[in-house]
Amino acid sequence: MTTAKRDTYTPETLLSVAVQVFIERGYDGTSMEHLSKAAGISKSSIYHHVAGKEELLRRAVSRALDELFGILDEEHARVGSAAERLEYVVRRMVEVLMAELPYVTLLLRVRGNTDTERWALERRREFDHRVADLLKAAAAEGDVRADVEVRLATRLVFGMINSIVEWYRPDGPDGRGGTGGAGGAGAAGEREVVDAVARLVFGGLRKSS
């Protein structure tokens, strides 16, 4: 990856560089030497700001988790029917994933080998359970088809949303987000992705009117 210039170094750029290195090499496969070279600064400069790479990991996954949990505190996630709140949360999850793509990608790839990773996994489970509770509530209110198994549906919804990190790239043609991979398999703006996920999820879940 491109080495950051020393004269542009800030704690925020260090975190951004660290996230990219963690994603590329894996957290366990990343040393402070790797981070030093990628950031273009000495290891002592890094230690001036953080205790070590695990603190960088915690800051990175905390950023993703704070954004996700923040969705649940927004007004439209708390007011209205369960189905309305669920759709709002799903849409906002996709928006946050795309806006914080590297940070959410890293969050989804932690393995649980360190205290920070185990903490992040526990927080992820807590978030997932709260969204699952919304789906259960929507089913209890009669807004979900009777033939839909709620637990399976929850897993499929999260699977669809989380898979976006594998193909979505914000620097698609003409500044629009696009799919990754050779040949540039088309482009999709952020709003198009959000709308497509919502249509697929709720077109399958909702009862026919």
Feature-to-residue mapping (PLM):
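Basic, helix-initiating cap at the start of DNA-binding domains
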Residues: M1-R25, G29-I41, E54-R58, R63, ...
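Generic detection of well-ordered alpha-helical segments
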Residues: T8, E12, S16, Q20, ...
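Key DNA-contact positions within bacterial/archaeal DNA-binding proteins
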Residues: S44
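A short His-aromatic
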Residues: Y47-V50, E54
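Hydrophobic alpha-helical connector segments
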Residues: R59, G70-A99, T154-V157, V194
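Amphipathic alpha-helical packing segments from all-alpha helical-bundle domains
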Residues: D66-F69, A99, T116-E141, V150-R155, ...
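Hydrophobic alpha-helical bundle segments that form small-molecule/ligand-binding pockets
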Residues: A77-G80, R125-A153, Y168-A187, L205-S208
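Amphipathic alpha-helical segments used for helix-helix packing
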Residues: R85, L97-E117, E166
